């Protein structure tokens, strides 16, 4: 994960001090890209321990079209707690947009099912895209989508994906985002009988919060370790039938975790 550490170093050295919605303050750069060859290992940060349970359960929650934190709470995942209302609702965030985007004529569009069908029937299409940025519903969302738009690409029997992330919390959020989309590529590839290719991450406002600076320096002092390997133990009938126990991460030997406050 040298790419990730190089980005963190770049933000520290070149970032512009900026105010932000949370009032915390950031060092920020605009426009950065990283490429991860998924054949080389699963891109899970090793210079601190990442909470893999949260990453997997959150993705399964998205895939189910869920926007209430009850499922997450049942599985001891607290990453969305700060944004939920008193009933646990978050409004029409990722899961709703991915699985039931509201069309003007009243239809509900299942973008992910459409992607699976496109990959199987027309893998050379340049329109294999999912968007969470629904302008008409942004004001109803507890948090506007940070990872907003992603596209799939097939070449030589390998499935690649590029994500555009309009806002990126480099220390806390980005390791989750990279691992989550890498996991999605593996799942999608399995469902479509493809090998995995690259995950390409593209960031807009890419920042370190002012209260994450010391933690970033600590992480940069650590040497990255060998990437782990993802094992999917069975092939379910559809993309939406995976369970938490279907996944093993072999050989994950990270440095200790580093605590940091969340900017809300």
Curated annotation (Swiss-Prot):
Catalytic-site annotation from UniProt: 146
Transmembrane segments: none
Superkingdom: Bacteria
Enzyme Commission identifier(s): 2.1.1.45
Single GO BP term: dTTP biosynthetic process
Catalytic activity of the protein: dUMP + (6R)-5,10-methylene-5,6,7,8-tetrahydrofolate = 7,8-dihydrofolate + dTMP
Principal cellular location given in the protein's record: cytoplasm
Residues holding dUMP: 21, 126-127, 166-169, 177, 207-209
UniProt key word Transferase: yes
Gene Ontology molecular function terms on file: thymidylate synthase activity
Recorded metabolic or biological pathway in which this protein acts: Pyrimidine metabolism; dTTP biosynthesis
Binding of (6R)-5,10-methylene-5,6,7,8-tetrahydrofolate, residues: 51, 169, 263
Example of a GO cellular component annotation carried by this entry: cytosol
Protein's UniProt keywords contain Heme: no
Cellular compartments annotated: Cytoplasm
Subunit annotation: Homodimer.
General function of this protein: Catalyzes the reductive methylation of 2'-deoxyuridine-5'-monophosphate (dUMP) to 2'-deoxythymidine-5'-monophosphate (dTMP) while utilizing 5,10-methylenetetrahydrofolate (mTHF) as the methyl donor and reductant in the reaction, yielding dihydrofolate (DHF) as a by-product. This enzymatic reaction provides an intracellular de novo source of dTMP, an essential precursor for DNA biosynthesis.
Family of the protein in this entry: Belongs to the thymidylate synthase family. Bacterial-type ThyA subfamily.
The protein's name in its UniProt record: Thymidylate synthase
Name of encoding gene: thyA
């Amino acid at each position: 994960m040298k790419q990730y550490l190089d980005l963190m170093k770049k933000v520290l050295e070149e970032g512009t001090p900026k105010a932000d919605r949370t009032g915390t303050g950031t060092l920020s750069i605009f426009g950065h890209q990283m490429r991860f060859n998924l054949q080389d290992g699963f891109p899970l940060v090793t210079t601190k321990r990442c909470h893999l349970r949260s990453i997997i359960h959150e993705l399964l929650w998205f895939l189910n079209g869920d926007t209430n934190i009850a499922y997450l709470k049942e599985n001891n995942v607290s990453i969305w707690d700060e944004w939920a209302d008193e009933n646990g609702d978050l409004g029409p965030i990722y899961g709703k947009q991915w699985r039931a985007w509201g069309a003007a004529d009243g239809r509900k569009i299942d973008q992910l099912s459409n992607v699976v069908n496109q990959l199987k029937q027309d893998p050379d299409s340049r329109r294999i895209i999912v968007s969470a940025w629904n302008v008409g519903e942004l004001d109803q969302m507890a948090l506007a989508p940070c990872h907003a738009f992603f596209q799939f690409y097939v070449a030589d029997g390998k499935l690649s994906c590029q994500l555009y992330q309009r806002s990126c919390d480099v220390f806390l959020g980005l390791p989750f985002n990279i691992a989550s989309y890498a996991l999605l590529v593996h799942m999608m590839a399995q469902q479509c009988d493809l090998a995995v290719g690259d995950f390409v991450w593209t960031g807009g406002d890419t920042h370190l919060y002012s209260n994450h600076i010391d933690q970033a320096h600590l992480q940069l002092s650590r040497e990255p370790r060998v990437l782990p390997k993802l094992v999917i133990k069975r092939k379910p009938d559809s993309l939406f039938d995976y369970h938490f126990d279907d996944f093993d991460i072999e050989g994950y030997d990270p440095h200790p975790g580093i605590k940091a406050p969340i900017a809300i």
